[in-house]
């Protein structure tokens, strides 16, 4: 009987049956042929074969201001898609023009942000402000509930204890500690204020990390006082002010996660938004966390929940940098913006350069561990692309015309006006981002 069932499941497909294995084989064969043809075409270009291809642990320039190399390979046209979608191996090469060097310098400057969280005095100060007993109690209770649910379903618990600690921190940070600022109230009469341009920072404000100051005027004509709103980037100062917008929220919350022992990434989005990623030892992957929205593990929030077009999402940590765009943009054709800052080969080169700079003095064993972690994350990011492609192929079949859940479905909040939500967040700031663009951070 078992043998009969086996033969029944492997019988040749009829004209009315759909064989996914056959479609998969045909698709793979087609991509092999296309990849081989493209590689042959590339091999005929002598300039391409001369381009350097540094590995993460080879000798490379460690400072953005170093001179151009003697050989300048021809640059392909920038792509609006992630390199994984082109199904071609990337041969990294260094920046060759002014725009590429500008982007490289920007990423190097941004990569310094998470290194500031390693100050022992800063972490001690942060711990003194966190209600540890409350957070650990909430985490313990939530962890027990998760474990009980897992036992009843005979499954592995979804989250571990450390994950629950960060989730408790997220709730406390959003609801009790940090405060959102649109227009700061008048400090003299507490009346709402009206934006009145910008002002240069005072020496004291500049010393505390304020690169720019927003100026507001009291809406009460009888008062007319001016209110200054320095945009502090120094985390020490944020522990005192406890207010700000997206940039301040992500910066301070990321540092708090580090203070609680978490491995932290500060994620920069080229559309001028920032958030946090925390590594889950339980799930062995990086988790998206947005302190402003109090969201946990909802990476598709921005593209699919808010309907935003996204080009670059670069995650920075004390271990280097990673292009995590594929985690947040599952369908580049629908939600991706043009990736035109630099060619993909140059972006890979810059990321490898930052990784080498952060890791070259680490023990060899730790370097190997991080390298394996990079490989595991790359497989995860490729899986997102493969699942999105599989869902699109499945929807092309006549029997699957009706809407169905995608295999990589992750729930996102149902926002009444997702477009307005993002636009409002961008209007909350009004200051230029690190690359000089006007944005919400």
UniProtKB/Swiss-Prot annotation:
Under the heading Pfam families, the entry gives: Transglut_core (PF01841)
InterPro entries annotated for this entry? Papain-like_cys_pep_sf (IPR038765), PNGase (IPR050883), Transglutaminase-like (IPR002931)
Residues that bear Methylhistidine = 6-8
Q: Which one GO biological process term can you cite for this protein?
A: glycoprotein catabolic process
Domain of life of the organism in this record? Answer: Eukaryota
Q: What residue spans carry the Low complexity bias annotation?
A: 46-84
GO terms under cellular component? cytosol; nucleus
Q: Where is this region: Disordered?
A: 1-23, 38-91, 397-441
- Which residues make up the binding site for Zn(2+)? 186, 189, 218, 223
Instruction: Enumerate the UniProt keywords alphabetically.
Output: Metal-binding, Methylation, Zinc
Molecular function (Gene Ontology), one example: peptide-N4-(N-acetyl-beta-glucosaminyl)asparagine amidase activity
Spans of biased composition, class Basic residues? 1-11
Q: PANTHER family from the entry?
A: PEPTIDE N-GLYCANASE PNGASE -RELATED (PTHR12143), PEPTIDE-N(4)-(N-ACETYL-BETA-GLUCOSAMINYL)ASPARAGINE AMIDASE (PTHR12143:SF19)
> Which family does the UniProt entry place this protein in?
Belongs to the transglutaminase-like superfamily. PNGase family.
Q: What is this protein called?
A: Protein PNG1
Species source reads Emericella nidulans (strain FGSC A4 / ATCC 38163 / CBS 112.46 / NRRL 194 / M139)
């Amino acid at each position: 009987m078992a043998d009969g069932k086996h033969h029944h499941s492997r019988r040749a497909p009829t004209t009315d049956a759909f064989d996914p294995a056959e479609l998969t084989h045909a698709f793979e064969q087609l991509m092999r042929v296309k990849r081989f043809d493209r590689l042959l075409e590339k091999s005929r270009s002598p300039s391409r074969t001369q381009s350097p291809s540094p590995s993460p642990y080879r000798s490379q320039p460690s400072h953005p201001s170093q001179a151009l190399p003697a050989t300048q390979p021809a640059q392909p046209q920038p792509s609006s898609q992630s390199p994984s979608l082109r199904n071609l191996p990337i041969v990294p090469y260094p920046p060759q023009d002014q725009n590429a060097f500008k982007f490289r310098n920007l990423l190097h400057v941004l990569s310094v942000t998470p290194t500031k969280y390693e100050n022992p005095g800063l972490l001690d100060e942060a711990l003194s402000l966190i209600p540890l007993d409350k957070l650990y109690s909430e985490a313990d209770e939530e962890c027990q509930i998760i474990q009980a649910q897992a036992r009843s379903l005979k499954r592995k618990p979804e989250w571990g204890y450390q994950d629950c600690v960060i989730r408790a921190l997220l709730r406390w940070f959003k609801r009790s500690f940090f405060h959102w600022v649109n227009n700061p109230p008048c400090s003299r009469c507490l009346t709402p204020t009206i934006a009145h341009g910008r002002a240069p920072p005072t020496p004291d404000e500049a010393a505390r990390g304020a690169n720019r100051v927003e100026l507001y005027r009291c809406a009460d004509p009888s008062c007319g006082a001016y209110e200054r709103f320095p945009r502090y980037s120094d985390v020490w100062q944020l522990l005192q002010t406890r207010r700000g917008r997206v940039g301040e929220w992500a910066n301070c919350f990321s540092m708090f996660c580090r203070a609680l022992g978490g491995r932290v990434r500060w994620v920069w989005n080229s559309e001028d938004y920032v958030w946090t990623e925390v590594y889950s030892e339980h799930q062995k992957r990086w988790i998206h966390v947005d302190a402003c929205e109090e969201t946990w593990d909802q990476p598709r929030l921005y593209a699919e929940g808010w309907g935003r077009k996204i080009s670059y999402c670069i995650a920075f940590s004390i271990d280097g940098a990673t292009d995590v765009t594929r985690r947040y943009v599952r369908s580049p054709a629908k939600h991706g913006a043009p990736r035109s800052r630099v060619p993909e080969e140059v972006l890979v080169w810059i990321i490898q350069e930052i990784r080498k700079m952060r890791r070259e003095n680490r023990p060899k064993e730790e370097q190997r561990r991080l390298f394996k972690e990079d490989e595991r994350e790359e497989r995860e990011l490729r899986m997102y692309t493969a699942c999105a492609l599989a869902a699109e192929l499945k929807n092309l079949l006549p029997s699957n015309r009706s809407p169905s859940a995608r295999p990589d479905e992750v729930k996102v909040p149902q926002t009444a006006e997702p477009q307005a939500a993002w636009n409002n967040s961008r209007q909350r700031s009004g200051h230029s981002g690190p690359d000089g663009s006007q944005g919400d951070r």
